[in-house]
Amino acid sequence: MQKYTSEARQLLALAIPVILAQVAQTAMGFVDTVMAGGYSATDMAAVAIGTSIWLPAILFGHGLLLALTPVIAQLNGSGRRERIAHQVRQGFWLAGFVSVLVMIVLWNAGYIIRSMHNIDPALADKAVGYLRALLWGAPGYLFFQVARNQCEGLAKTKPGMVMGFLGLLVNIPVNYIFIYGHFGMPELGGIGCGVATAAVYWVMFIAMLSYIKHARSMRDIRNEKGFGKPDSVVMKRLIQLGLPIALALFFEVTLFAVVALLVSPLGIVDVAGHQIALNFSSLMFVLPMSLAAAVTIRVGYRLGQGSTLGAQTAARTGLGVGICMAVVTAIFTVTLRKHIALLYNDNPEVVALAAQLMLLAAVYQISDSIQVIGSGILRGYKDTRSIFFITFTAYWVLGLPSGYILALTDLVVDRMGPAGFWMGFIIGLTSAAVLMMLRMRYLQRQPSAIILQRAAR
């Protein structure tokens, strides 16, 4: 029991800064929305539309670079720290190549925006302008993620938290300058949010790079031979590990976007109730997601040490802590669901629907916690392909079709409306949780030599 208690303390020490970093990131989006809304409703809508396109594109790159964390954790655990600098350099090359692709996609996103049904031309122009300002921050964001993944792979999660809050503090005044046109800058409205956020991502990257350069604990990792050329072998391996994670993230984000589109014709009350429940459950998701990042670090480190039993302990402890957290958040959600809904809206119909959907959200929080921590465990074992196949099958083959049938057809029961889609979420997430656990059990039952050989690749 003592080993699990000790492991839980180490996991929480890693996870809490990640949680706070995610809070800072979420707060940046909130600040952008509020400040753009203070300028005009059209600008706020433009920021919302632009963000809905920015997120899938940038999260694809973010997911690709997550491969660095288990690689660095494993090298650190095995005492091969001299190889980490080369992996990080290749991470920067990969981030640079992906940035170009993301920027091209975002520059041409106007075709998608203007094809939206009945969109106001002025709104479309502002959304395109916002994206074309924001896209210059894509390299800064992805380079920051490489530096952050280096730190987290070395079990240092506090720098990411500090840089997150630094970004938030810089974002507010820079937003003010570019939205309203102060200190000689042009008055850009919502487009100014894009300029400010792009600038903030570069500030966060430069600050993180400065920390790494001066940190005593990373002196042995610094590159003294220049930046070096791309290494096709290392980059290929990073892509093999990262691409399944990137695709899983992309399909998860697009799933919720598709459901939002399917709910939109059902009416204002249904859309508002769905959005409130989804927004709140997304906030709760920060806890298991951050714990999953910590589990990846611990599992990778233990495998680097050659301890498959230590990796099992880290995995089981992570699941136990995650389930306990999920039970607490589920009880909190059930108990205060009406009060929470009232924070968003005071329309009785909207509040009633949101409260009903939050009951379903409380049910799936446990499954969601298990599946996301399971994903973190599999990343630690460098078994990322299974993450993609499991999430794609659970969300798109099981969850979305069953949600559609329950919500919009009479095939099984009378049409359930938004609640049907939430039942689909429960089916999809529970399926993912079960499949993740089966895959984890299969991996852990393999001979230690095979597990360690996979981890050392």
From Swiss-Prot:
GO biological process: sodium ion transport; xenobiotic transmembrane transport
Principal location: membrane
Pfam family, one: MatE
Coiled-coil intervals, chain numbering: none
GO molecular function annotations of the record: antiporter activity; xenobiotic transmembrane transporter activity
Residues that span the membrane, as ranges: 11-31, 53-73, 93-113, 127-147, 160-180, 188-208, 243-263, 276-296, 314-334, 350-370, 387-407, 418-438
Location of this chain's protein in the cell: Cell inner membrane
InterPro entries named among the record's database cross-references: MATE_fam, MATE_MdtK, MdtK-like, Multidrug-R_MdtK
Entry keywords, A to Z: Antiport, Cell inner membrane, Cell membrane, Ion transport, Membrane, Sodium, Sodium transport, Transmembrane, Transmembrane helix, Transport
Record's bilayer topology term: Multi-pass membrane protein
Domain of life: Bacteria
GO CC annotation, single: plasma membrane
Keyword Translocase in annotation: no
UniProt keyword Signal present: no
Similarity comment: Belongs to the multi antimicrobial extrusion (MATE) (TC 2.A.66.1) family. MdtK subfamily.
HAMAP family, per database record: MdtK
Function: Multidrug efflux pump that functions probably as a Na(+)/drug antiporter.
Protein name: Multidrug resistance protein MdtK
Gene: mdtK
